[in-house]
Every structure is written in C-alpha cells, then in structure tokens.
C-alpha cells in the first residue's frame, strides 16, 4: 500500500553530523524516501588532559553529572578512558533525553533523572526537584551549548560546574557536498537538528534556501531552539511535537499524507 511508504517520491536533505546521519538516512529510505547526506558540522575534544586531576577530584565529590547530548556522553567516556579515570558509583546521573540515556546505558550507566520534554529548561526543572543542597551539579557540554542549567540552579544555592568537553566546528568536506547537492537535487524537505547546522547552512546557501521554500520546500526543525535559529534568518519551519529524529520523520510523513489528500 502507498501509505506503507509515506515518503515515496520525496527527497530529504539531512544536514546532520556524519557520524549520526546514517540512522536518519536508513529511516527515511525505509519510509520510501531518498535521503541526501551533507554533514555541515563536526566535533573535536576541548577538555585538555592537564586538568585530569581536577576532573578526578570533581568526580569524587557527591552530586550529579548532567549530560545534555549524546556527544557529551561520548566525549566524557573517551576522556575517562584516555586519562585512566573511573566514574564513581555514588554519582547521580541526569540526561536530557532518550538518546542520551541510551548512550549512557551502553557504558553501563543508568540514568536517575530525565525530563519528559527533551530540552534544557525541563532538565533544569527536574534537577530542582531531585538535587539536594550541598550536592555539586556538573554539566557536560559543548562550546556552543547554552548555560540554562547554571542560570536556573545557581540562584537557588546549588553549586554548578560546567565541563566544556567538545567544540563544534564546520565540516568543510560536508559543506562542499552541500554545494554539490544543491545543484543536483530538488528537495521536498530540508532537516535541521541543531542551531549550529542552521547557521552553517545559512552562511553557505541562505539565499538558495529562501528560493527553495518559495518553490515548495519545507524546513523541518528538531525543536524550538533550531526553529528560532531559522527565524532569525526569516525562515519558517515545522517542528514535531516530540523533539527527536523519529518525531521529525513522523511529521514529514504526516505532511506528505496530507499533501496527497489535497
């Protein structure tokens, strides 16, 4: 049946980081669509080895480790391994969402707190309810991550530390691939999974995207922050109810089915 492949005949531009884009591509193709991959950003470690002793001391203290992304989890455990550090069993763990929690589980780490809505504001609210006075809250983050948790919790008397584990940089190879793809395909959907991909895309092909939208291309944002980033360039987008890749896919399927009914 046609409904078994709601993205049949649709071309989806995936601007996600290369390491994380494969599953997105597979899901688009399983729904009958064609996915074109252009990795616009990549990541590199930012926390130097010469602070390993301070990290060891922070890990030994009672309190929370807060993971706001899969990248944060990956770079954290890579750092521990390289510096022969161990995550103490007494540490409480908070994760921003399901994917981050699943990645932590791969490292045999269970999550104590996870908000129902996968954004930093909701994670901060959850920590307010579960953290106790005297506990240090240490946030694993990237250089472009917001400091919502610190802003929300410090005024309440919590000690909040931030470890900048990784930094986001443009993927020059992916940017060239984007330029090539723009000349080869017409896109039904352009997907954005972070504000940084929005800014990189708009720097490279901002005017082209406006033309694509005028011709019927729809932009799909993973969540409100990414949506807001597009709005700063005058670009409107559609955002799923659930701020995940699966939510984006469900939204595109729904839009495609609605288009068929018109």
Curated annotation (Swiss-Prot):
It catalyses: hydroxymethylbilane = uroporphyrinogen III + H2O. CDD domains: HemD. Gene3D superfamilies: 3.40.50.10090. InterPro entries: 4pyrrol_syn_uPrphyn_synt_sf (IPR036108), 4pyrrol_synth_uPrphyn_synth (IPR003754), UROS/Hem4 (IPR039793). GO terms for molecular function: uroporphyrinogen-III synthase activity. SUPFAM superfamilies: HemD-like. Keywords: Lyase, Porphyrin biosynthesis. The keyword Lyase applies. The keyword Oxidoreductase does not apply. Its EC number is 4.2.1.75. One of its GO terms (biological process) is protoporphyrinogen IX biosynthetic process. It holds the Pfam family HEM4. Pathway: Porphyrin-containing compound metabolism; protoporphyrin-IX biosynthesis; coproporphyrinogen-III from 5-aminolevulinate: step 3/4. Catalyzes cyclization of the linear tetrapyrrole, hydroxymethylbilane, to the macrocyclic uroporphyrinogen III. Monomer. Belongs to the uroporphyrinogen-III synthase family. This is Uroporphyrinogen-III synthase. It comes from Bacillus subtilis (strain 168).
């Amino acid at each position: 049946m046609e409904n078994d492949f709601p993205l049949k005949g649709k071309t989806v531009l995936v601007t996600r980081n290369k390491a994380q884009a494969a599953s997105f591509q597979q899901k688009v193709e399983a729904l009958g669509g064609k996915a074109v991959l252009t990795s616009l950003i990549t990541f590199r470690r930012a926390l130097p080895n010469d602070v390993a002793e301070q990290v060891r001391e922070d890990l030994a203290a009672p309190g929370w480790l807060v993971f706001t992304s899969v990248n944060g989890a990956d770079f954290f455990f890579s750092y521990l391994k390289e510096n022969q550090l161990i995550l103490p069993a007494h540490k409480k763990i908070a994760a921003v969402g399901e994917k981050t929690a699943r990645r932590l589980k791969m490292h045999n780490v269970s999550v104590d707190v996870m908000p129902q809505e996968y954004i930093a504001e909701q994670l901060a609210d959850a920590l307010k309810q579960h953290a106790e006075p005297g506990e240090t809250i240490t946030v694993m983050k990237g250089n472009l991550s917001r400091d919502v948790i610190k802003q929300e919790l410090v005024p309440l008397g919590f000690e909040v530390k931030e470890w900048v584990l990784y930094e986001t940089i443009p993927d020059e190879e992916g940017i060239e691939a984007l330029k090539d793809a723009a000349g080869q395909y017409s896109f039904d959907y352009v997907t954005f999974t972070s504000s940084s991909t929005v800014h990189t895309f708009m720097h490279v092909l901002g005017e082209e995207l406006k033309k694509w939208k005028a011709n019927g291309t729809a932009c799909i944002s993973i969540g409100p922050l990414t949506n807001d980033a597009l709005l700063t360039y005058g670009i409107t987008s559609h955002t799923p109810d659930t701020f995940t890749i699966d939510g984006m896919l469900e939204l595109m399927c729904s839009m495609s089915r609605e288009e068929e009914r018109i």
